[in-house]
């Protein structure tokens, strides 16, 4: 028996792309992003993207009303609950203190912490950029192409084989969201994994009669 077949089917892994402008965020959507991380963008860029793509969820620092959301969104879980937002927490203790149900939370982790994070029972966001709160000091970023025995790709080069393998493995193990700087190749890796898991519908169904 192939033990990998025991991976239970579940929801597809969502792709979050980091962007700092509305144009870059829109490009990410075109390349397969399900969510956009605009925490580094100015409010005007966030507003422009939301106007252009009202149905795409946005990750933003929302402690003020500058983003068109309620003030205190991340400081007061009750505000988050009333707004319908999901909170991203760096530690499971924070998630437990929030009082929100698991489906309204995401635990952010680096690839190295994925298995431990999944054991907590909360949906997990895997950060491949190395810049998130779950990355930890001194850890390398798979998105940069850095891994043991592999040199980093300078600048904004595409992710290496190690990064795509980490993305695929994250989806296979059950990560709810994968965050990346490179949407198109990571989307392909996640789609391949979801197809193997049996949770990605075919692009076209063809039926014929003999």
PLM regions and their residue ranges:
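Active-site-adjacent loop and "lid" segments of alpha/beta metabolic enzymes
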Residues: 2-31, 43-210
